[in-house]
């Protein structure tokens, strides 16, 4: 199978780039308009289409530019990509933002805005943190995942048992074991627990009093 030097060069050049670097793959600026993106894609597609390029890697390179164009030509996907720095449909690799976030920033959170921006900011409307209940709801109830679904599945559910001091159960409804977290006890329940402990101690003392004081007195009275 014959191919030209230029055909080999363009195919290998595309494949040498990170598969998530969509702007670099299409050779356009990050502020490129839709028409500029389409023009750049068509230019590359003509050179890489298997019918036009006989290099063994041309088909693979063609798929790469197709994916880049599919994301950048879609307003919603492009917006997500610009935020997380990777293919919004690929959940296997950590985002560039999350990876760089662990380096920290001067005077700021050691997370540096990577992981927090990706998850907490999208969940809590730009705030850096939220109540523990909100975080659990986010993790188990599809409550604002940056990919539109809970990481534990779209069918996750929450059930509460035993009132304020009971348990909140999170389950993905797929036959797996539920996740349980005890809710904070109310002040009234804490007081009740303390009273129960005192009563238990009094009962123990009463038993000892009967054994060592009352019973010997009864014995002396009966057999004296």
From Swiss-Prot:
GO terms for cellular component: endoplasmic reticulum; endoplasmic reticulum membrane. Pfam families: DnaJ. Residues 18-87 form the J domain. The modification Phosphoserine is found at residue 109. SMART domains: DnaJ (SM00271). Residues 181-192 have a biased composition (Low complexity). This is Protein HLJ1. One of its GO terms (molecular function) is ATPase activator activity.
């Amino acid at each position: 199978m014959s191919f030209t030097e230029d055909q080999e060069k363009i195919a290998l050049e595309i494949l040498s780039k990170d598969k998530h670097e969509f702007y670099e793959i299409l050779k356009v600026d990050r502020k490129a308009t839709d028409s500029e993106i389409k023009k750049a894609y068509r230019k590359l597609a003509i050179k890489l289409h298997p019918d036009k390029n006989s290099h063994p890697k041309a088909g693979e390179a063609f798929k790469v530019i197709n994916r880049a164009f599919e994301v950048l030509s879609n307003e919603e996907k492009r917006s997500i990509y610009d935020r997380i720095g990777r293919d919004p449909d690929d959940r296997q690799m950590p985002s560039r933002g999350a990876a760089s976030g662990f380096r920290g920033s001067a005077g700021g959170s050691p997370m540096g805005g990577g992981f927090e921006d990706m998850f907490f900011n999208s969940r809590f409307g730009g705030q850096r943190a939220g109540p523990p209940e909100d975080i659990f709801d986010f993790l188990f109830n599809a409550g604002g995942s940056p990919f539109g679904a809970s990481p534990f599945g779209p069918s996750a559910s929450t059930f509460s048992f035993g009132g304020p001091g009971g348990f909140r159960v999170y389950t993905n409804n797929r036959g797996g074991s539920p996740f349980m977290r005890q809710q904070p006890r109310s002040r009234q329940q804490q007081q009740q627990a303390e009273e129960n402990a005192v009563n238990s101690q009094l009962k123990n003392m009463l038993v000892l009093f009967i054994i060592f004081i009352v019973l010997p007195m009864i014995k002396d009275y009966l057999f004296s």
